């Protein structure tokens, strides 16, 4: 797999989970002899919701909620077959969305 790149994008609501998962991926890739670029923190997406507390009147009474989506990017340069096998067997946390692309 010479001159190839594996790009891994991670998304999670909890920044501790995503940092733990990126550390596992980087450690696994380095252990198998691949060159790693990252983890690169991408901009955090903040979704804000405003909800009326009162069912009828009192428009001034509101609650605001926020969901933050943290993202990371990891590039693995020149992966070996061993690297790909190790990454496929890697068990990551349940709250982390992983997208892998070959390029």
Curated annotation (Swiss-Prot):
One of its GO terms (biological process) is translation. GO terms for cellular component: ribonucleoprotein complex; ribosome. The keyword Ribonucleoprotein applies. InterPro entries: Ribosomal_uS10, Ribosomal_uS10_CS, Ribosomal_uS10_dom, Ribosomal_uS10_dom_sf. SMART domains: Ribosomal_S10 (SM01403). Keywords: Ribonucleoprotein, Ribosomal protein. It comes from the Bacteria. The keyword Chloroplast does not apply. Part of the 30S ribosomal subunit. Belongs to the universal ribosomal protein uS10 family. This is Small ribosomal subunit protein uS10.
């Amino acid at each position: 797999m010479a001159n190839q790149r594996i790009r891994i994008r991670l998304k999670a609501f909890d920044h501790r989970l995503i940092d733990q998962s990126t550390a596992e991926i980087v450690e696994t890739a380095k252990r198998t002899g691949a060159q790693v670029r990252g983890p690169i923190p991408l901009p955090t997406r903040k979704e804000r919701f405003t909800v009326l507390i009162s069912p009828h009147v009192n428009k001034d009474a509101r609650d605001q909620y926020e969901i933050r989506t943290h993202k990371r990017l990891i590039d693995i340069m020149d992966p070996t077959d061993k690297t790909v096998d190790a990454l496929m067997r890697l068990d990551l946390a349940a709250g982390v969305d992983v997208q892998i692309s070959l390029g």
